[in-house]
Amino acid sequence: MFDTKQTLDAFDPEIWQSIQDEAQRQEEHIELIASENYTSPMVMEAQGTKLTNKYAEGYPGKRYYGGCEYVDKAEALAIERAKTLFGADYANVQPHSGSQANSAVYAALCSPGDTVLGMSLAHGGHLTHGASVSFSGKMYNAVQYGINPDTGLVDYEEIANLAREHKPKMIVAGFSAYSQVLDWQKFRDIADEVGAYLMVDMAHVAGLVAAGVYPSPVQIADVTTSTTHKTLRGPRGGIILAKANPEIEKKLNSAVFPGGQGGPLMHVIAAKAISFKEAMTDEYKAYQKQVVANAKAMAATFNERGIKIVSGGTENHLMLVDLIGKEYTGKDADAALGAAYITVNKNAVPNDPRSPFVTSGLRVGTPAVTTRGFKEKQCIDLTNWICDVLESLENGNSEQVIADVKAKVLAVCAEFPVYK
């Protein structure tokens, strides 16, 4: 029998302290990593429930273990809410992550050795879109497309030519570092021309899609995948969506279980259901509109300060800051901003002369600061502070500038707490 009066801080003070330190970091640092966000207390509450105790291999109504009648209800709610939220005919809410969702789609629609056409990691794609170090580049014949280095935009003619040349079994559309709107229909047309499946990975923009501020790929692609965190602001996990196709739906279910996973995480699935319900509210739609407005304000301010943005601006939640030609690297900028309590991530940019571990760019995103309550004014101020730090790296006065900016960050974070 468990003693429910026993406390974590008393039993395991080391882990407790790590949790408290991270909570303090989240409150006192400005989070600009484009893939990060703060989830709601209700989502976190669900993840800490007794649902974590239940094994539920299989799907609702078709489990391998007994005692699943209540977790069946939770998963059925998550499935129906996901379908309603995204206008999908099919949803699988069991993938533990976005990468595992993508892996399941590859397994369902392709065979090892098949050709897959995806966006290069160096140009803004994801590891699972064919990178050589990923399963997608090791198990499949990965052909990579990129962006036009002059415009910073996806080159659809290049994609069409590569598709005609290599005849891929599947084309992957989506990104982890691209600031413009992808034309899902153009990808569909290219896929149809060469007889390929079209998979869209909308992990970065799923929240924007749910709110109607970014075009939906769900009824255009054969299969759409996403994480449930990032802009969607739910728990860490994955999801697979599709338009009606019984044959593909059966393959997808089998690829997730038993093909790639065993028991689903029922406490996380319940949290996913909560986040989908949150995403149906008017407040959530207003939040996503503000995410884009804040990103546009930041991009415009970078441009005004003479800091180049790849593609010139943004139409979503993120932007790539191009530091090619600067005396400092993306790694240097990342570290300096981190010392000022501004968290970003170094990122490769098109034609980057530096290694992926050093880079000549930064990726910046607004989902987390918008959750804090930042509007355009705070984001403009923040961008100016970032530019001050970057300029100080060239002017030799970075120590004082970083200290000044850190003080401003602490003040604005106190004014806009994450969790009241």
UniProtKB/Swiss-Prot annotation:
EC main group: transferase
UniProt keyword annotation of Glycosyltransferase present: no
Catalytic activity line of the entry: (6R)-5,10-methylene-5,6,7,8-tetrahydrofolate + glycine + H2O = (6S)-5,6,7,8-tetrahydrofolate + L-serine
Keywords, comma-separated and alphabetical: Amino-acid biosynthesis, Cytoplasm, One-carbon metabolism, Pyridoxal phosphate, Transferase
SUPFAM superfamilies in the cross-refs: PLP-dependent transferases
Entries under InterPro entries matching the protein: PyrdxlP-dep_Trfase, PyrdxlP-dep_Trfase_major, PyrdxlP-dep_Trfase_small, Ser_HO-MeTrfase, Ser_HO-MeTrfase-like, Ser_HO-MeTrfase_PLP_BS, SHMT-like_dom
Self-association and partners: Homodimer.
Protein name: Serine hydroxymethyltransferase
Site annotation Plays an important role in substrate specificity: residues: 229
One GO MF term: pyridoxal phosphate binding
Entry annotated with the keyword Lipid metabolism: no
Chief site of localization: cytoplasm
Residues forming coiled coils: none
Gene: glyA
Modified residues (N6-(pyridoxal phosphate)lysine): 230
Family membership noted in the UniProt record: Belongs to the SHMT family.
Naturally occurring in which organism (per UniProt): Saccharophagus degradans (strain 2-40 / ATCC 43961 / DSM 17024)
EC number: 2.1.2.1
UniProt function note: Catalyzes the reversible interconversion of serine and glycine with tetrahydrofolate (THF) serving as the one-carbon carrier. This reaction serves as the major source of one-carbon groups required for the biosynthesis of purines, thymidylate, methionine, and other important biomolecules. Also exhibits THF-independent aldolase activity toward beta-hydroxyamino acids, producing glycine and aldehydes, via a retro-aldol mechanism.
CDD domains linked: SHMT
UniProt pathway annotation: One-carbon metabolism; tetrahydrofolate interconversion; Amino-acid biosynthesis; glycine biosynthesis; glycine from L-serine: step 1/1
Residue numbers binding (6S)-5,6,7,8-tetrahydrofolate: 121, 125-127, 355-357
